[in-house]
C-alpha cells in the first residue's frame, strides 16, 4: 500500500509580502503608527543624553573659523531634560539695551580692563612701577586705534552718521562749475600780503572797563541784557562800499564773509555766499533772512549737538543763544553812559540817519583795501568792538567775543567752574577742539580789522537746563597774530583760498554765482545761478537804493 507524501508538512510555506513602491523617492511611503510623533535628533554614541553642563569643550579664540572643528551631533535639545515644576516663578526680563548719556560712556572701562588683565597694573599690562611692560608691537596690536588685534571691531562701526541739511536747496536750473575739496585748499598759499590800508573809518567806540579782568569763578558777574541795535548789513547794501566801488577796488566784501571763506577748511556745517560779477568787479554777499550771522556751537566736536528742535540744546537754539551772549557781552564790558568818554572816527555810523533816535551798539567800521596781486584790489568793511586806554595814553582797538558753556556733560567738555581759574589752558584747548571754526573766524576778523587785542569772555549758564540766564566767569586776552599762530591758523593759506575763489569767478562771464559748503562732505562747490535767484519780492517801492538795508537785529529782545 503506497503512502501519500505531504510536501506541505515538510517545507515551510512562503507568503509574498506587500511591497510599497515610492515613485517620488526612496523609503516607505507611509510611517507605521508605532513610529509616529517620535522626535529625531542626529547623535553620536559617545554623546550623553540630557547634558546639564559640558566642560570638555576647549575655548576657541579663532573667531573667523570657530565652526571648523564643530560637530553637528549633540547640538539639539529634543532629549534634553527640563525641570518643569518651577514654571510659576519664571518671569520675563527686559534685555533692551539702555542708551547711556555721553558723560557716562566708558565709566568702568579701566576697572573692566584691570580684571581682564589689560589694565595699567594688571598682568601683562603697562606697569608704572617697573614690573612688566608690553612691547610696542603688542601695544599696537591691542590698541583699537590701529584697527588690528583685539581692538578691531569686526565691521561694527556703530550707527551711521546723521546727514546734515544744506544751507540752501540746490535747484534744477543751477549749473555746477567747480568742486574744491579741502585737501586741495589746505595746500594753497599766498604769502607776503601786506597789512590793509584804511580808506574810510566810521562809527563810535566806547572804552573797555578793566574791572572785568578781575572776574573769576568765585567772583562771577551776571550777564545783562543790553537793549542796543546791531546792524548786520551785507556788502551791496552798504552805502560806503557803493560809494567806494566807483573809484577803488574790484573785489568787495565784509570781514564776516571773508572770514567764512578763509576758514572754510575748518567748517563742518553748510554755508553759502552769493557772488555777483559785473564787468571786472566782484561783489560777495550773504543772503537775506538767513542764519549766516548766527554763531555755531560745538561745530567741530566729536559729538555735536543733537538735531532736536524742541530741545534748547539743538544746534539752531544753541546758535541763537551764543549770538545773544556775544552781543550782550561785547556791550556790557564797555563803559556806557553819557558822561563816559568815547572814541569817534572820522565819519558817523553809515547805517543810521541823523534824525533817528535809537541806541546803537558800540561798533567802529574800517573800510580797508589789500593788494592781492594780478591787479586784484580787495575792499572790505571790518569792525572793532571797543577801545582800551593804555597807561601811556594810547588807544588800542579791541575785538570782543564770548565763549559760552551750555552743558559740559552733554558736550563732553570741561567743567568751567572747576578748572577755569586753575587750568584755563585746558578749558581753552577744549574749546579749540569743539569750536575750531568759530575761533578761527574771530581771529581772522581781528587780523583783518587790525585790532590790537582779541578779548575772549567765558560765559556759562546759571543752570544747565535754563538757557536764558548766564554769568560771566572770566576773561582772557590775546594778540591776534600770536593767537593765530597758537591755533595753527596760517594767514598765507587763508589768503590763498580767497585768491583761488576770486580767480575762479574772474574767469566766468558776468552774472550771479553761489559758493556753498557741502553739508556732509569736505567740499566747496561753485554754482552758476540765474540772475533773479534770491531776489526779494517784498521790498517797498518807495525806498531808495541807499535805504534798502538789510534788517537790523535787536538781540536783547530775541526770544531764546
Curated annotation (Swiss-Prot):
Its main location: cytoplasm. The keyword Ion transport does not apply. Residues 100-121, 147-156 have a biased composition (Basic residues). The modification Phosphothreonine is found at residue 128. One of its GO terms (biological process) is formation of cytoplasmic translation initiation complex. It comes from the Eukaryota. Keywords: Cytoplasm, Initiation factor, Phosphoprotein, Protein biosynthesis, RNA-binding. One of its GO terms (molecular function) is mRNA cap binding. Signal peptide: none annotated. Pfam families: eIF-3_zeta (PF05091). One of its GO terms (cellular component) is nucleus. Residues 291-305 are annotated as: RNA gate. It is found in: Cytoplasm. The keyword Lyase does not apply. Residues 98-166 are annotated as: Disordered. Component of the eukaryotic translation initiation factor 3 (eIF-3) complex. The eIF-3 complex interacts with pix. PANTHER family: EUKARYOTIC TRANSLATION INITIATION FACTOR 3 SUBUNIT 7, EUKARYOTIC TRANSLATION INITIATION FACTOR 3 SUBUNIT D. mRNA cap-binding component of the eukaryotic translation initiation factor 3 (eIF-3) complex, which is involved in protein synthesis of a specialized repertoire of mRNAs and, together with other initiation factors, stimulates binding of mRNA and methionyl-tRNAi to the 40S ribosome. The eIF-3 complex specifically targets and initiates translation of a subset of mRNAs involved in cell proliferation. In the eIF-3 complex, eif3d specifically recognizes and binds the 7-methylguanosine cap of a subset of mRNAs. The RNA gate region regulates mRNA cap recognition to prevent promiscuous mRNA-binding before assembly of eif3d into the full eukaryotic translation initiation factor 3 (eIF-3) complex. Belongs to the eIF-3 subunit D family. This is Eukaryotic translation initiation factor 3 subunit D-1. It comes from Drosophila yakuba (Fruit fly). The lineage of its organism: Eukaryota, Metazoa, Ecdysozoa, Arthropoda, Hexapoda.
Amino acid at each position: 500500500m503506497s503512502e501519500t507524501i505531504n510536501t506541505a508538512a515538510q517545507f515551510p510555506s512562503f507568503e509574498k509580502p506587500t511591497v510599497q513602491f515610492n515613485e517620488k523617492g526612496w523609503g516607505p511611503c507611509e510611517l507605521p503608527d508605532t513610529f509616529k510623533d517620535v522626535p529625531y535628533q542626529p547623535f553620536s554614541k559617545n554623546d550623553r543624553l540630557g547634558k546639564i553642563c559640558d566642560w570638555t569643550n576647549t575655548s576657541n579664540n579663532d573667531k573667523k573659523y570657530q565652526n571648523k572643528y564643530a560637530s553637528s551631533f549633540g547640538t539639539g535639545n529634543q532629549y534634553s531634560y527640563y525641570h518643569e515644576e518651577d514654571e510659576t516663578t519664571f518671569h520675563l526680563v527686559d534685555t533692551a539695551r539702555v542708551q547711556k548719556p555721553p558723560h557716562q560712556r566708558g565709566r568702568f572701562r579701566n576697572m573692566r580692563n584691570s580684571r581682564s588683565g589689560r589694565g595699567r597694573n594688571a598682568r601683562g599690562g603697562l606697569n608704572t612701577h617697573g614690573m612688566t611692560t608690553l612691547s610696542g608691537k603688542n601695544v599696537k596690536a591691542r590698541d583699537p586705534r590701529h584697527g588690528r588685534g583685539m581692538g578691531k571691531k569686526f565691521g561694527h562701526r556703530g550707527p551711521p552718521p546723521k546727514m546734515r541739511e544744506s544751507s540752501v536747496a540746490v535747484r534744477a536750473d543751477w549749473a555746477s562749475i567747480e568742486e574744491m575739496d579741502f585737501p586741495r585748499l589746505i595746500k594753497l598759499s599766498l604769502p607776503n600780503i601786506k597789512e590793509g590800508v584804511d580808506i574810510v573809518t566810521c562809527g563810535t567806540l566806547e572804552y573797555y572797563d578793566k574791572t572785568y579782568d578781575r572776574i573769576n569763578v568765585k567772583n562771577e558777574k551776571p550777564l545783562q541784557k543790553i537793549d542796543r541795535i546791531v546792524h548786520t548789513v551785507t556788502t551791496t547794501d552798504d552805502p560806503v562800499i557803493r560809494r567806494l566801488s566807483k573809484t577803488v577796488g574790484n573785489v568787495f566784501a565784509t570781514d564776516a564773509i571773508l572770514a567764512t571763506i578763509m576758514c572754510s577748511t575748518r567748517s563742518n556745517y553748510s554755508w553759502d555766499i552769493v557772488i555777483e560779477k559785473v564787468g571786472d568787479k566782484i561783489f560777495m554777499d550773504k543772503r537775506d533772512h538767513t542764519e549766516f550771522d548766527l554763531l555755531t556751537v560745538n561745530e567741530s566736536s566729536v559729538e555735536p549737538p543733537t538735531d532736536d528742535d524742541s530741545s534748547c540744546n539743538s544746534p539752531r537754539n544753541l546758535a541763537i543763544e551764543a549770538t545773544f551772549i556775544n552781543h550782550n557781552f561785547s556791550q556790557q564790558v564797555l563803559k556806557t553812559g553819557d558822561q563816559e568818554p568815547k572814541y569817534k572816527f572820522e565819519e558817523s555810523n553809515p547805517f543810521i540817519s541823523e534824525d533817528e533816535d535809537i541806541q546803537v551798539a558800540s561798533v567802529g567800521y574800517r573800510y580797508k583795501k589789500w593788494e592781492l596781486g594780478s591787479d586784484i584790489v580787495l575792499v572790505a568793511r571790518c569792525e572793532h568792538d571797543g577801545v582800551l586806554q593804555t597807561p601811556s595814553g594810547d588807544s588800542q582797538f579791541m575785538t570782543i567775543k564770548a565763549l559760552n558753556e551750555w552743558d559740559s556733560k552733554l558736550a563732553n567738555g570741561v567743567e568751567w567752574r572747576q578748572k577755569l581759574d586753575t587750568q584755563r589752558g585746558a578749558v581753552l584747548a577744549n574749546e579749540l577742539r569743539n569750536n575750531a571754526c568759530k575761533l578761527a573766524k574771530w581771529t581772522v576778523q581781528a587780523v583783518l580789522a587790525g585790532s590790537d587785542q582779541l578779548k575772549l569772555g567765558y560765559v556759562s549758564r546759571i543752570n544747565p537746563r535754563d538757557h536764558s540766564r548766564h554769568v560771566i566767569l572770566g576773561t582772557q586776552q590775546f594778540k591776534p597774530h600770536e593767537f593765530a599762530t597758537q591755533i595753527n591758523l596760517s594767514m598765507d593759506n587763508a589768503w590763498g583760498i580767497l585768491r583761488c575763489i576770486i580767480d575762479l569767478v574772474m574767469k566766468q562771464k558776468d552774472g550771479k554765482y553761489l559758493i556753498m559748503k557741502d553739508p556732509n562732505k569736505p567740499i566747496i562747490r561753485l554754482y552758476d545761478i540765474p540772475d533773479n535767484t534770491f531776489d526779494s519780492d517784498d521790498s517797498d517801492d518807495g525806498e531808495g537804493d541807499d535805504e534798502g538795508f538789510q534788517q537790523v537785529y535787536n538781540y536783547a529782545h530775541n526770544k531764546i
